[in-house]
A protein has these predicted regions:
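Compact, glycine-rich, soluble single-domain proteins
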Residues: 1-122
Length: 122
């Protein structure tokens, strides 16, 4: 993802063609990675937050459940959690990026471990 504020990005499962999110946001610096989704009341349908580089996240102080996938640099899902509750930690030894999605999105898109995710400009 570039830093172009005009560009729109979506997250697609390469195996199924399903769009996991059509409003993709990145947390690539230290401050934005620390903040993540903290302070939000919910996560909108179609939204996703990519946190990179990281191989661990927490949901401390969060007010809602989320789906989380950890991917390799190549975009392969190495670990995932559905409906991760607040006040939890989640890590993936081989993870490079964490992608946080609204709870239920992984099941709705038939996304499984080993799938490759890709970012598309549209």
């Amino acid at each position: 993802m570039s830093q172009n504020p005009e560009a729109r990005y979506r997250l697609v499962n390469a195996r199924t063609g399903e769009v996991l999110a059509d409003s993709l946001h990145g947390a690539f610096d230290s401050a934005s990675r620390r903040k993540g989704l903290l302070g939000r009341e919910s996560m909108g349908e179609g939204q996703a937050l990519i946190i990179a580089p990281t191989n661990a996240i927490h949901t401390w102080f969060m007010k809602f459940e989320i789906d989380v996938v950890f991917t390799s640099k190549a975009g392969l899902i190495v670990k995932m959690s559905q409906s991760l509750k607040p006040w939890r930690m989640f890590a993936a030894l081989r993870g490079y990026a964490a992608i946080e999605l609204p709870a239920g999105r992984l099941a709705a898109t038939n996304t499984i471990r080993g799938d490759r995710l890709r970012i598309e400009v549209y």
